[in-house]
Amino acid sequence: MIIDVNTPISSRLDKYLKRLYPLLTQGVIEKALRQKQITVNAQKAEASLRVKGGDKIFINDKFNLPVKQPEKLVFTDAEIKLAKKITTDYLIYADDNLIAINKPAGLATQGGTKINLSIDSALKYLNYKGADFKLVHRLDKKTSGLLLIAKNYLSSVKLHNAFKEKLVVKTYFAVTYGKPIKNVGEVRSNIEKSKGSTPKITDIDSENGKLAITYYKVLKSLDNNLFLIEFTPVTGRMHQLRLHAKLLGCPILGDDKYGNKEIMPYSKYMFLHANNICLSEKIFGQESKLEAKLPFYFTRRLT
């Protein structure tokens, strides 16, 4: 059997084979490569070899692909219900490459400790039903707004690269307690994140952490020393906007991790919303501008 590699983006041989044949294990692949049951361009290959469009993978006809059936996945009623909402109620935009949803606050993007329901777990149900959705970025559980989901592997690679190359511009709205000294400005810091610890600001000249850059603009003065601020992150560090708001002296309303509970008004919700995303035409051939409506509690606070 001959497989013509059709992806324009290089991929490790073992990962490429696993996408085609999910039942193939790493051990089986490496053994087949050692025995030349699987070759690339008629040459012996390593599992780490990167294959790309134009390459040919040869699989010996006598090589037995695994025939056992995968275990039946079990999904909860909540995951099935959420999967339906992702493709209906939460859906903002869809094309051949991606979908964009308006994630509500309180819903996790990915699973974790004490998290039983997430966007990712619902996508697994949709993929079980024949889709090929892949997360390409995340929002904090308490953050609402625009979340992009790739429709296939190639689109996910393009979007991952686009985020790295700064071809995706995201804009957030936040209600903060207090305001920066300047109404328009830029925040630069290092953000350090150790495994199992909460992200923290470190000195810009420190060797610890990674550089984080955020632009901001004060849009409106509200009551009770609250302000509406627009944040545009240049980098994408964990909790970046929440930490930078705190660094500016104006923590986000409802942020119980980085805010000052003793002086800030109590809020059930955290007022941080991913409002706009602009995708450069360099990603999929045309520029796309997407917007997610503010949640009801956010709109009510602004009036």
Curated annotation (Swiss-Prot):
Keywords: Isomerase, RNA-binding, rRNA processing. Pfam families: PseudoU_synth_2 (PF00849), S4 (PF01479). Gene3D superfamilies: Pseudouridine synthase, RNA-binding S4 domain. The active site is at D140. It catalyses: uridine(955/2504/2580) in 23S rRNA = pseudouridine(955/2504/2580) in 23S rRNA. PROSITE patterns: PSI_RLU (PS01129), S4 (PS50889). Its EC number is 5.4.99.24. It comes from the Bacteria. One of its GO terms (molecular function) is 23S rRNA pseudouridine(955/2504/2580) synthase activity. CDD domains: PseudoU_synth_RluA_like (cd02869), S4 (cd00165). Residues 11-70 form the S4 RNA-binding domain. The keyword Transport does not apply. GO terms for biological process: enzyme-directed rRNA pseudouridine synthesis. InterPro entries: PsdUridine_synth_cat_dom_sf, PsdUridine_synth_RluA-like_CS, PsdUridine_synth_RsuA/RluA, RluA_PseudoU_synthase, S4_RNA-bd, S4_RNA-bd_sf. Responsible for synthesis of pseudouridine from uracil at positions 955, 2504 and 2580 in 23S ribosomal RNA. Belongs to the pseudouridine synthase RluA family. This is Ribosomal large subunit pseudouridine synthase C. The lineage of its organism: Bacteria, Pseudomonadati, Pseudomonadota, Alphaproteobacteria, Rickettsiales. The gene is rluC.
